[in-house]
């Protein structure tokens, strides 16, 4: 079944995506080496709520986190924990935002400073090139 979206629905979806981008950018600016992944999860929740949005994943199928966060070779859908972020950790965050009953859900990966691990840089560049 195909559900057609109204102009209002499409506008709300665009707003949700704009909020997602703001949360992503602010999260990347504020996450620092020495934070735990649970602190990153809590920060993401604060940022999402700041824009009057809802963290989509929280309590979905009993998921305990606000976002999914995985470090280095962990599989996606990781849960924030007491793991302390280290220099050159590769972090993948999957963020779902519900805004006006519409969802924006996407993941991104970045390398924590000083970002001088050439093997991690290569995998990110190769993956990006394949997707684009």
Show where each model-derived region lies.
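Active-site neighborhoods and metal-handling regions in enzymes and metal-associated proteins
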Residues: 1-132
């Amino acid at each position: 079944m195909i559900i057609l979206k109204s102009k209002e629905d499409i506008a709300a979806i665009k707003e949700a995506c704009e909020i997602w981008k703001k949360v992503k950018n602010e999260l990347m600016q504020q996450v620092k080496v020495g934070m735990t992944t649970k602190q990153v999860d809590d920060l993401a929740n604060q940022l999402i709520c700041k824009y009057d949005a809802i963290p989509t994943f929280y309590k979905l199928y009993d998921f305990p986190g606000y976002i999914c966060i995985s470090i280095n070779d962990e599989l996606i859908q990781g849960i924030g924990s007491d793991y302390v972020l280290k220099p050159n950790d590769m972090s993948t965050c999957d963020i779902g935002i519900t805004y006006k009953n519409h969802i924006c859900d996407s993941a991104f990966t970045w390398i924590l400073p000083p970002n001088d691990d050439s093997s991690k840089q290569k995998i990110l560049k190769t993956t990006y090139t394949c997707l684009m």
